[in-house]
Regions:
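Active-site-proximal C-terminal subdomain of hydrolase catalytic domains
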Residues: 2, 79-145
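Caspase-like (clan CD) cysteine peptidase catalytic core
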Residues: 7-34, 38-96, 143
Length: 145
């Protein structure tokens, strides 16, 4: 999906679950997200921000812990997740998310099952753009041959 809304992302996650369930443990799932992430100011939990979320309330986004839980709900061969987003509260282009500065701490106990997660940054780190290539630096090197 390109420029996915919250509804479209949730539908996509549901479709992935249906695929995993129907393959009876033989599915190999790959999930990729490039965009903004944002921490909740009170709980410090990380959220992915779809295009229809304004960035003022992280809870309007897709909670990472819920995403991981849904991706491992059914038995699969493996699940690989690639996230090119930062959760420091800053935005690559310093747009409306730039004023936030909430440090999150990874919660490793939320990840269960045969899932591996690759992220462009963690905690208070920023994910950098590669403007000349119109990608994030993480995505550019992920796609490079």
């Amino acid at each position: 999906m390109l420029d996915a809304t919250t509804g479209q992302m949730n539908q996509g996650i549901s479709k992935i679950n249906l695929i995993a369930k129907s393959t009876k443990g033989n599915a190999e799932l790959f999930v990729y997200f490039a965009g903004h992430g944002l921490p909740d100011e009170q709980t410090k939990e990380a959220y992915l921000m779809p295009v229809d979320v304004n960035g003022k309330n992280a809870k309007d986004g897709i909670k990472l812990a819920n995403l991981y839980s849904k991706l491992t709900e059914f038995q699969t061969k493996n699940v690989s997740v690639f996230i090119d987003a930062c959760f420091s509260g800053g935005a690559r282009n310093q747009s409306l998310l730039a004023a936030r500065g909430v440090k999150i701490q990874p919660k490793e106990d939320i990840i269960k099952g045969n899932i591996v997660i690759f992220t462009a940054s963690s905690g208070a780190q920023s994910s950098l753009p590669y403007k000349e290539k119109n990608h994030g630096l993480f995505t550019y090197y992920l796609l490079k041959k």
